Amino acid sequence: DVEPNFADTLPLIEETANPRSVGVMENTVQSLIDADELYGRSINFRGGQRALLRYGLENTRVYLPGMGPAVGAEAASSVYGAFLDTQLATTNPISLNNVGAYLSQSKEMGYTYGTMQADNGESAEGFEASYMRLWRFNRSGEWRIAVEVLSPF
């Protein structure tokens, strides 16, 4: 049995902006989608590890097939980068297809989901995965990834 522990969530809450702050109240679903697409481009430019270091919270969590959650910016980005490097094994860029997004009523949290795949040209084979990202709006006025879940198909 797993018992909830509020102390585990305190670091995440400390990184998140106050829902009543002006920057948060101006958030839209489109700003969340824009952050998701920017992150996808960053994976191509920086690689998965550096992209997650840039866009993840200090207490981010990454869930990948066959392993427990990687918790914390360093561990999560390292595991995420290694996973993408192993799956891709090429220099082909990843294309991201955002399927949807939801913004909480308080506008400081939301999630995006969709698919990502390697652009393999004529080849039909290659990396394909669905993703879900839980985003938190941080105190610096930026959307940051709190949770990343990848599921290859």
Regions found by a protein language model. Give the residues of each.
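A solvent-exposed, acidic/Ser-Thr-rich amphipathic alpha-helical stretch
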Residues: Q49-Y102, S106, Y113, S123-G126
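Short glycine/acidic-enriched loop and turn motifs that connect beta-strands
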Residues: Q117-N120
